[in-house]
Amino acid sequence: MRIYKLGVIGKPIGHSLSPKIHNLFAQQTGIKIDYQPYQVSPDALDIFIRDFFNNGGDGLNITLPHKIACIESADDKSALVKKIGAANILIHNKDSNKIIADSTDGNGFVEDLHCKAIKLAQTNVLILGGGGAAQSIIPAIQNEKPANIFIDNRSPGKIQPVIERYLSSGDNNDGPFSSLSDLKSFSGTSHIKQGM
């Protein structure tokens, strides 16, 4: 039986539950995997990714701080990655010998909300942060038809380009984007309790 060489890269990485989750999933499905965590600094990212796949790697999960920078190491990008400018998975296509960047964050995020019976339709949504993880969930949130999407970041100057990207994408029919300075109109939302 084939053993798939997989891993998760980030910095730091010791806190990641990905190895445990993926190994349990592999046991449940009868797939053999070698899934390892790799702490990779930003300056070594491209070299690590190329070496991993050149030495038989099948796929990598990507976490902070590499979700944006990792796409530079990909030979091809999904339409979603081209739109959002971030990825959370790199897959080696053995037939074409190409590294493919994709993102499953948004669909996974929304599916988790659905499992908890949380609906986003016609609600106000607040996103804190404007990095790769935040940007990767915006299209999936838009598909849920919220009334408004509010977004803010510790560095306010980084938010405007994110807002403009999604407003200019031509498919934002799901309510306007606003910055946190407009929060006075952020009312009528469901509150998610800590510990859920």
Annotated model-derived regions:
Residues 2-116:
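Phosphate/diphosphate ligand-binding glycine-rich loop within oxidoreductases
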Residues 32-36, 98, 148, 176-178, ...:
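Conserved beta-strand segments of alpha/beta enzyme cores
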Residues 144-169:
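NAD(P)-binding Rossmann-fold cofactor-contacting core
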